[in-house]
UniProtKB/Swiss-Prot annotation:
This is Small ribosomal subunit protein uS9. The gene is rpsI. PROSITE patterns: RIBOSOMAL_S9. It comes from Crocosphaera subtropica (strain ATCC 51142 / BH68) (Cyanothece sp. (strain ATCC 51142)). HAMAP family: Ribosomal_uS9_B (MF_00532_B). One of its GO terms (molecular function) is structural constituent of ribosome. NCBIfam families: PRK00132.1 (NF001099). Belongs to the universal ribosomal protein uS9 family. Residues 118-137 have a biased composition (Basic residues).
Amino acid sequence: MQATENKEKVVYWGTGRRKSAVARVRLVPGSGEIIVNKKPGNIYFNRIPDYLQAIKGPLETLGLENDYDILVNAHGGGLTGQADAVKLGVARALCELAPENRPPLKAEGYLTRDPRAKERKKYGLHKARKAPQYSKR
């Protein structure tokens, strides 16, 4: 039997989190397409250009915006949290691609995980910090 040459594409993985959103990101050599949960990025993010611009940010910093396709599996949270999670995942995948990508991405703040999350509700209060109305008499 004749051996067939299998040219596998090299895939780079990165995981991003923001609020309660988690995004598992794959960078595959391609033309700059963004696919989120098997849908084109502009349809998934309701054609909101700010989200797509944020996702492409790490690639634009390195001048690679048309060299890799971004394949994403995102769940949890809302669109803003998912977009920021994807951005962090892309940046981490680019660090896996080449270690010399790390300093420019870190300088731009793409490798920093935003720690802000919803504060839990406390008993005796209406919300996390909103107290019931105080009556002096």
